[in-house]
């Protein structure tokens, strides 16, 4: 295993939202449209494309390996079933000097969640650090609440402790890193606009 930041050199290109976002020296995230752009794939030397969706069709290009992860972007979807096998596959591609593109429809939820699982397992990052790094490379990432619960469970499975937790909010359960922004979204005039975390109550 490598150290947490060894695969994340400062000379990486600036984060890209419409194109491919480089997460490590061998891992990229994108949306479905970018994943089917031959020029983007070749210019970034992608050798493996992992499609984490049921709605995006693959354009099969020669000399690229395709892996399908048929999961919908819904909190009840069991994306965690793929945490280990996909992390292992990304690592295997890197060991062969290849590069992996991980994508879903928007490059926001499903592919981001699998990226976080990979960083935890193979770069020994905490979930908090993995999220901070990935978000710095692709600012639009936002796994759904169900995927967050699965990632938190996976972090505990790997390390025996958690750096994040799910908390109650007027919008339902959310990871605690979203607590501040969710509190700011609640109208001041709403009587029930109090944000609860355990027994604590923060008034707006």
From Swiss-Prot:
One of its GO terms (biological process) is peptidyl-tyrosine dephosphorylation. One of its GO terms (molecular function) is phosphatase activity. PROSITE patterns: TYR_PHOSPHATASE_1, TYR_PHOSPHATASE_2, TYR_PHOSPHATASE_DUAL. Its EC number is 3.1.3.16, 3.1.3.48. SMART domains: DSPc (SM00195). Keywords: Cytoplasm, Hydrolase, Membrane, Mitochondrion, Mitochondrion inner membrane, Nucleus, Protein phosphatase. InterPro entries: Atypical_DUSP_subfamB (IPR020420), Dual-sp_phosphatase_cat-dom (IPR000340), Prot-tyrosine_phosphatase-like (IPR029021), Tyr_Pase_AS (IPR016130), Tyr_Pase_dom (IPR000387), TYR_PHOSPHATASE_DUAL_dom (IPR020422). It is found in: Cytoplasm; Nucleus; Mitochondrion inner membrane. Residues 19-160 form the Tyrosine-protein phosphatase domain. CDD domains: DUSP18_21. Residues 95-141 are annotated as: Sufficient for mitochondrial localization. It catalyses: O-phospho-L-tyrosyl-[protein] + H2O = L-tyrosyl-[protein] + phosphate; O-phospho-L-seryl-[protein] + H2O = L-seryl-[protein] + phosphate; O-phospho-L-threonyl-[protein] + H2O = L-threonyl-[protein] + phosphate. It holds the Pfam family DSPc. Its main location: cytoplasm. GO terms for cellular component: cytoplasm; mitochondrial inner membrane; nucleus. It is a peripheral membrane protein. The active site is at residue 104. PANTHER family: DUAL SPECIFICITY PROTEIN PHOSPHATASE 18, DUAL SPECIFICITY PROTEIN PHOSPHATASE 21. Belongs to the protein-tyrosine phosphatase family. Non-receptor class dual specificity subfamily. Can dephosphorylate single and diphosphorylated synthetic MAPK peptides, with preference for the phosphotyrosine and diphosphorylated forms over phosphothreonine. In vitro, dephosphorylates p-nitrophenyl phosphate (pNPP). This is Dual specificity protein phosphatase 18. It comes from Rattus norvegicus (Rat). The lineage of its organism: Eukaryota, Metazoa, Chordata, Craniata, Vertebrata. The gene is Dusp18.
């Amino acid at each position: 295993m490598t150290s947490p930041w060894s695969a994340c050199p400062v000379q990486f290109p600036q984060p890209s939202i419409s194109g491919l976002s480089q997460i490590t020296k061998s891992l990229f995230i994108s949306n479905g449209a970018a994943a089917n752009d031959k020029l983007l794939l070749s210019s970034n030397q992608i050798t493996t494309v992992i499609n984490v969706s049921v709605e995006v069709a693959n354009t099969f290009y020669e000399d690229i390996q395709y892996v399908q992860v048929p999961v919908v972007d819904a909190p009840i979807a069991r994306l965690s079933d793929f945490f280990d096998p996909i992390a292992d596959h990304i690592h295997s591609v890197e060991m062969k000097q290849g590069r992996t593109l991980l994508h879903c429809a928007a490059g926001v939820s499903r592919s981001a969640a699998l990226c976080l699982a990979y960083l935890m397992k193979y770069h020994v990052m905490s979930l908090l650090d993995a999220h901070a790094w990935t978000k710095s490379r692709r600012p639009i990432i936002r796994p759904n609440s169900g995927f967050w619960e699965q990632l938190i469970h996976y972090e505990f499975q790997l390390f025996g402790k958690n750096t994040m937790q799910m908390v109650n909010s007027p919008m339902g359960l959310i990871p605690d890193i979203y607590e501040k922004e969710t509190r700011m979204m609640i109208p001041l005039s709403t009587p029930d606009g109090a944000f609860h975390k355990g027994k604590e109550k923060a008034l707006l």
